[in-house]
UniProtKB/Swiss-Prot annotation:
This is Quinolinate synthase. Iminosuccinate binds at residues 24, 41, 112-114, 129, 197-199, 214. The keyword Metal-binding applies. It is an enzyme of class 2 (transferase). Belongs to the quinolinate synthase family. Type 2 subfamily. It comes from Citrifermentans bemidjiense (strain ATCC BAA-1014 / DSM 16622 / JCM 12645 / Bem).
Length: 304
C-alpha cells in the first residue's frame, strides 16, 4: 500500500467512524499532514473537550490520550501506539507525590500536563508550557509544589515571587541540548534569533531570544521580521514551521532533539487503530473526576 493510498484510507475511516485525528506538534511529518488538528498539549486538550466527534484518535503519547479521556469521557479515545510513553511523566509517582505533600501540608500542587492521570488526580491545578506562568500567577498561595519538570518550574519561578518546591523531573530530549552548542550556533548565525522551549535546561534558556511553547514558536516565527531562526525544541515542529513560513529558514539547535516516543506512531498504526478501534485509553472514574477538576481549573484561566 502506498503512502497516498494509506492516507486516503485513513481519511475514509475517520469519516466512517465519526472520528477526529489530533496530532501533537512533535509527531512525524506524515502524521501531522493527515491530522484534522495539530497543536500543543493545551490546544489539543481544548479540542478534545469540545469536539463533536464520537471517536478521538490521539497521535501523541499516553498522558495526552489520558487527558482526552478525562475531558471527554463519553468519547472513545484511541492511542495508535500504546507504548508511546513519556519518560518525564514516569519520573513522578502517586506515592512519591503524596509523600512530598505530607511533608508540605497545605502547599498546593501545580502539575505539568506531562504527567499521568493518577498524578493529575493528586494535584490542585494543571498547566501546560503555554499557560504555566498564568496558572501560577493566578494562585494566591505563597508556596507551590511544582511537578514533574524542574526546568519548566525554574523558568516560571522567574515571573513570580512564590517559593517553588521543584520535583526533580525533566524531559530527556530537551535536556540533551547543551548551552555550548547553542553558543556556537548563535555565533555562527548572528542574524538568527534562538527560540527555545522552557523544558530546556536553564543554562540554555538563558541564551534564548524568546522562550515559549510550540504554539508560541509558530506565532513568534510568523510575526518576526527575521528570516532565519535557531529552534530549541523537538524536531517535529519543523514541518509546520517550514510549511507556514516557506520564505524563512529554520535551524534545529541539535540533531539530538528527537523524541523516540513521539516518533513511534506511523500512518500504519493510525490506520490499524481506526480499523480495529483499539487500543482504547479509558481513565477510571475514581481517577478521572479529581484529575478533571485539576484540568478544568487550568482551562478556566483566560487565554490571551
Amino acid at each position: 500500500m502506498t503512502q497516498e493510498t494509506l492516507k486516503a484510507d485513513i481519511k475514509a475511516l475517520l469519516k466512517e467512524r465519526n472520528a477526529v485525528l489530533l496530532a501533537h506538534n512533535y509527531m512525524r511529518d506524515e502524521v501531522q499532514e493527515i491530522a484534522d488538528i495539530t497543536g500543543d498539549s493545551l490546544a489539543l486538550s481544548i479540542e478534545a473537550a469540545k469536539t463533536d466527534a464520537e471517536v478521538i484518535v490521539f497521535c501523541g503519547v499516553h498522558f495526552m490520550a489520558e487527558s482526552a479521556s478525562i475531558l471527554a469521557p463519553e468519547k472513545t479515545v484511541l492511542l495508535p501506539r500504546l507504548d508511546a510513553g513519556c519518560p518525564m511523566a514516569d519520573m513522578v509517582s502517586v506515592e512519591a507525590l503524596r509523600e512530598m505533600k505530607a511533608k508540605l501540608p497545605g502547599v498546593p500542587v501545580v502539575t505539568y500536563v506531562n504527567s499521568s492521570a493518577a498524578v493529575k488526580a493528586e494535584s490542585d491545578i494543571c498547566c501546560t508550557s503555554a499557560n504555566a506562568v498564568k496558572v501560577v500567577q493566578s494562585m494566591s498561595e505563597k508556596e507551590i509544589i511544582f511537578a514533574p519538570d524542574r526546568n519548566l518550574g525554574s523558568y516560571i519561578a522567574r515571573f513570580t515571587d512564590k517559593k517553588f518546591h521543584l520535583w526533580e523531573g525533566y524531559c530527556p530530549t530537551h535536556e540533551r541540548l547543551r548551552p555550548e552548542v547553542v553558543k556556537e550556533l548563535k555565533q555562527a548565525n548572528p542574524d538568527a534569533p534562538f527560540v527555545c522551549h522552557p523544558e530546556c535546561n536553564p543554562k540554555v534558556v538563558e541564551l534564548a531570544d524568546h522562550v515559549c511553547s510550540t504554539t508560541g514558536m509558530y506565532d513568534y516565527c510568523k510575526k518576526s521580521g527575521a528570516k532565519r531562526f535557531i529552534i530549541g525544541t523537538e524536531a517535529g515542529i519543523l514541518w509546520r514551521l517550514k510549511r507556514e513560513n516557506p520564505d524563512k529558514e529554520f535551524i534545529l539547535a541539535s540533531p539530538a532533539l528527537i523524541c523516540p516516543n513521539m516518533k513511534l506512531t506511523s500512518l500504519e498504526d493510525v490506520f490499524e487503530a481506526l480499523q480495529q478501534m483499539k487500543p482504547v485509553v479509558k481513565v477510571p472514574e475514581d481517577i478521572r473526576i479529581p484529575a478533571k477538576r485539576a484540568l478544568d481549573r487550568m482551562l478556566a484561566i483566560p487565554r490571551d
